Amino acid sequence: MEELDGSLSQTRKAHRIEQMVARWLRRSRDSSARAKVAAADGPPGNPAQALTPVRHTVTLDKDVLLQNYGFHISETLPLTVVAVTAGGSAHGKLFPGDQILQMNNELAEDLSCERAADILRETEDALSITVVRCTSGVPKSSFLTEEKRARLKSNPVKVHFAEEVLVSGHSQGNSLLCMPNVLKVYLENGQTKAFKFEANTTVKDIILTVKEKLSIRSIEYFALALEEQYSISRLHLLHEEELVQQVVEREESQDSRCLFRVSFVPKDPLDLLKEDPVAFEYLYLQSCSDVLQERFAVEMKCNSALRLAALHIQERIYACAQPQKISLKYIEKDWGIENFISPTLLRNMKGKDIKKAISFHMKRNQNLLEPRQKQLISAAQLRLNYLQILGELKTYGGKVFNATLMLQDRESYIALLVGAKYGISQIINSKLNIISTLAEFANISRVELTEESEKVSMVKVYLQDVKVLTLLLESSSAKDLACLIAGYYRLFVDPANSVFHWSGNRRPTHRVSAEEGYESRACSDSEESSEVDCVLEPLSDRCLVKLSLCRPFAREEQPPGDSPTPEATRRGPSTCGASSMTDSAESEASDSANTESRGCRTSGSSESMDALEEDDLDACSSSGTSFFHFGPPGFSKGLETNSQEENSRVETSGFLCLLDLGQNANPQCQKIDGPQGLASEACSWGPELSMGRLDPRLYEGSRTDYYNLCSSISPGSHLSDSGSESTASRQGAAPPQWCQQGWMEAQSGSMLESLGLPALPPLAFEGGSSDEEYYDAADKLTPPDTLSGPRAADPSAMRLQSQSRTRGSEESLHPGPEGGEPSRQGGVKKYAKSLRKRRSFLQTDHTSQVSFPLEASASQENTDDVCYYDREPYLTLTAPSPTVSSLQDMQGEPGLLETKALGLLASLRETKSTNPASRIMEMEPETMETKSVIDSRVSSISAIRLRIDPSNTENPVTTDGSSASIPHSPHHSNPGSSSPQAAQVRPFPIVSPDQDPGGTTPKELTAEPEDSTFPLSSDHPNPDNPGPHHVSQGDTSELGEVRSEIGSESFLINHVQEVIPQITGPLCPGDGPTSGECEVNSEETALAADEVQGQLSLDSDREVMHRNGPSLFQKGSGKDLGDSKGDRLDNVPQALDVRAPAGEINSSLCSEPPATGTGQTSSDSEGENREAQEQELLTELDLAPDFLLPSAFPPETIKAEQLDRVIGEDSVPVSTSQQVCVHTVPSLPKLSPCQEEPRSADSGHGSPAESKGDDSPIICLPPERSFLCFAPESHPEGSTSLSRVTSFSFAGINEVAPAEIGIEHCRCQFSYATCFRGLQPETEEEDGDPQTHPAAPLTSPPSAGSQVTLPWRAARAYSCTTPLSRKSHIWPEFCSRALRQLKTTPTNAPEGFVQLTESLLELQDILEASWGVGNKHPPDKCTLHFSESRSRLCMGSQKLLASCQHVIRMDQSPEEMQGAVRVTFQHLVQLAGLCFQFTDCSRCSTRHREVAGNLRDVVYTYHQFVEAAKLTCERGYHDFSVKLLARQCTALTAAVFCLTQKFRASTAL
């Protein structure tokens, strides 16, 4: 019963509550209804609804800047205020809708509209106006008035606002969508709008809706953009024709948010203020937000940021009607100083200094007015001045794109700047603010965007006057560029026309070279095509006058499909008359001829298009061919080069013009009349030909003519034999048939019709478009001897080389009995073409290498003598470096310096021209400017041609006996193609300039001092069947000064692609190894797939002396083995890296001084203890007594070189599991007495080619003894003695932190984002060391064993069966110690840079070998590890960049610079240690692998930075040295940016 009573009472209470709620609801409904009725029936003065009129009398000062009072009146009576200018004098005092009662004591009812307007114009100083205002009529939004709201209701739009909702219980955050069909748009005024979209809703619909909502008139300035959530600097424009559904479905859009921005910044903000005050206010708010978010921090100085903060504060004070004397304390307390100053300034400046600076600038801002002006500055003036200061920044008024510009004869990596003030410009030097205009928006006819690969796209900008600009960019950047150009075109040129139409569903149908006849401007698809710069060959510019004409620009502007292609063109190359050639040439319709190109071998830029697949042999030399313009028949009557009349006729007519440096015509070709004379002059050959060239008259005369030379050459516009004949002409064969048959008489009439030269381009293009173009021409024609080094070639050597090449050319003229028959060659070429597939290959971070099909062996049999080095197998990398600068030719040719990554830095062909390179600089001084990417913004695109010959059919040696020779030049690197083994071993062959143009290498090896040659034989031309190289003792090869001057200044680094040294060494006669020889067993050698096994027989009595400059090998006293101090020879360089000069020989060992007298002499007294030293070494190594010690190497060399290889001294990035064993011979031969030699290959760039081709054999211990060197406690004596030879050396590194720690003073030399080192003291910087971070998961815990530290280089430390990985028990032992040793090893100052180079090589070896599987972390903790890794990596990167800024300061001595370099190296090692600590899981392993590659790029780029610092210390602070150092610092900044970008721009997965 009690339970029943309780339930009844609860029921009663519930009913009572329900009744109470119902009563409340009923009362509220009744009261609202009564209120509505009262409002409808009540008097008009009811305060619930009636408008309360209020009279206001205000006095307005005339705005001096705008020359008005900041408001507009209606054109009809009654007089009302229609609009108020934002920031003007009337802003905040008058409002739209105010009815004017009185103006300057004149009643409005007595005024007409015209009279009121006159009063506004005539009043000089102040205007008194009385208005009546309804209090409830003030709009709730400063953007949206009542009348606008009514218009919106009467004119609905397609896109509807939607309320923000929660999806699946999660907050919206910064997501792109509120719900599946609702787009979230962020406005710069702080508002957020959500738009519901349908399947057919476009971006333009949303823009128009926002336009109506915000009452914006000038909507052409606005666009929607996607901002990456974790990288606010990356904004991607959306094309107005894109469907919103497609935008939100993209994978890359998931971590982005949509912004409504002023994406097209006006030239002058004053124009926008007068045109649309609302848009101007929006731009101002957007700019303030960008400054606070530090979008321009890379460019903005500290002083500018503080001045902008002062302007922002003053603008807020005036806009909010605050008292003018407001204190900064009030602002800081009520408003917050963080709303005006960026976080970086707040962190790095004291509050007292900030207040002082802002007060100073606020007083200074009052001076913006004229002195006689009495009124205060207005808010509009403050806003305008704010935007004008920002307009000085390139990143504000424009957007920077790093792209590959495809020019006529090469591709150039450039930094583009696109903006209202700049048009389409190229940044020549960002530090000096040197910009060259490429095109104006008014000259653009259309823009095309085509996809080249998943991550790379091509943008073609068609110009009205100069054909087309073709650019390769990342896909997102390419789309931004196209949208930006189209937007500015619509803004400044034609609002009704769009030059870029979006077709999101259209897929590109072709690549850079396509199957359907899409041709490259200067490429070839035949087997004779030269992959080295054809136009740089001595004869190409004179001989390859093709049967093609420069078409008028009217035809060139047509798109590829605008004009029909004749059947002759589609059918292929014409085989008969010139008439068919002319028809096909005139109807050829490709408009991309001057945009695509073959790879440039002169720039050496991996950031540029290093290679594009060639399309047609005739187009291979179109850069040289197109420079020939054939004129009327009278031209063929004769051309006497010594006749002023004829010279003037050529100059004025522009019929025949050839770009070159030569000024004198060939004396052998003078006084030759008729077509035979022309053929002889244009196609003659001989050792002295390069001295006779025609002046570049057409080029110097008109820039438009230069672009006229970019006409495309159709494959069907030439004779079928022209390719092979042109190639034969280029290589020194007989003149082509068209040169011998007087073809110009037959073609003169038809040629005149297509020779019309276009008019000059407008001044917009004339201003700066030729900077890069002239640079290209200079680069194209620069003699390689000036490019490769500052010193001139030895005349005797040049003469011998010329003779050698001449003989090789003569032998290559007739490769077979019928080799000269055009018909046979044509058939062979057709057969080869049928087996060859054209394709282009673009490599980015997301692409892989592509191998090309094999070529026909039959064609190679006939053409191998013609194009030998043309088919070098170029390999490239998987992790391209963003921007690396080449230090090549810093002394001899500063005019050709350019920001380039050291990609395929093949040596230019050796020419016989001795013309100085100064003429190039006289022709275009601007080319001396270095080109720099704008601070830390970088492109990761490089275009690569990958040539692989899996069947080893490339580069066959067609001559027997001595056909394979090692080319030699005192100024050029070894080609890497001296033998089939060398050609197949090298992943990065260096093409020698001394090779015969026909492809046959020189039959003689030139040695400069002796003025003699040394034939070198090859008994095993087949790479698949390697055997020992045998050369008689008299055949000792000496490679002299292999780019020694470049070796001291440049390190040929292409990411992880290695430069392989030429395989040379002590070679002995005989068919097999003798008792005094060390044979590398090829059966036990496991190399990578692209390597070739070989055996090396070493002579027991003779060694090869390799010269690398006069100071490389000097006589020095030997040091005792037990010298524990580790002193080295002062006169002997500390490192002969394989990376310094490309192809440099790593060993310098001699037992007998050569004839040159540059070798070290041996001492009889030093040879007495050889046997004892051998036994001691074997004891230290714990080797068997019968272990072989080759007689060619002293004990020190074995310890420094061979032991290094045993313990992992060198790294092989190409082969990870290489096994190299040495046969043991019972007898120990006599040792060479040479005592102290630098270790042989301390570079991480060695490849397996070193393993069998280096002078030092690779010793591989038995498996059970392979790791004994990493147990120093078990062999203390061996550890002690070996530590001396392999010790790390770097000038003055120490871990002592400065005593005084504090915030560094900013001198404002750089942007404020980089001029502060940060708040962390130096002691905190050491926290990044791998040994002092116990909280992070250590991959290499401290060793528990002996504290004896051996500075092992973490490279190839593995047994004969097990490859090294981070899981190996060696890794925790030597990696931590190696890094710690690198960071703490002190050195003396004189050898600082040399030893720093060694330490860098040690670090590179560690990086190459250490990155393996690594430790793991649970996937559920990946987010935590990611966040920690990102913060520490960014901190370490910031420290490194901050220390690098101290290196490039001008006000310091060389000693101070060396100290600053030491600090940077410490930070670099610390950064590497941070990366080593990364642990991974299945979710983040890919990102960490990319970090490994990017870290290697950072180290390589830092290597060049150190070289530039060394050059600056040696030469002093000259303008050129400082520019070079600054440019290298920029390259390093870009590399570090790429390292951290993966973490900044991605989430924790």
UniProtKB/Swiss-Prot annotation:
Gene Ontology biological process terms in this record: establishment of protein localization to membrane; light adaption; protein transport; regulation of G protein-coupled receptor signaling pathway; response to light intensity; signal transduction
Gene assigned in the entry: Frmpd1
Stretches with biased composition (Low complexity): 962-980
Keyword Cell membrane: yes
PROSITE patterns: FERM_3, PDZ
Biased composition (Polar residues): 717-730, 950-961
Domain FERM residue range list: 181-496
Subunit structure: Interacts with GPSM1. Interacts with GPSM2.
Protein name as annotated: FERM and PDZ domain-containing protein 1
Membrane topology: Peripheral membrane protein
Protein localization: Cytoplasm, Cytosol; Cell membrane
Organism: Mus musculus (Mouse)
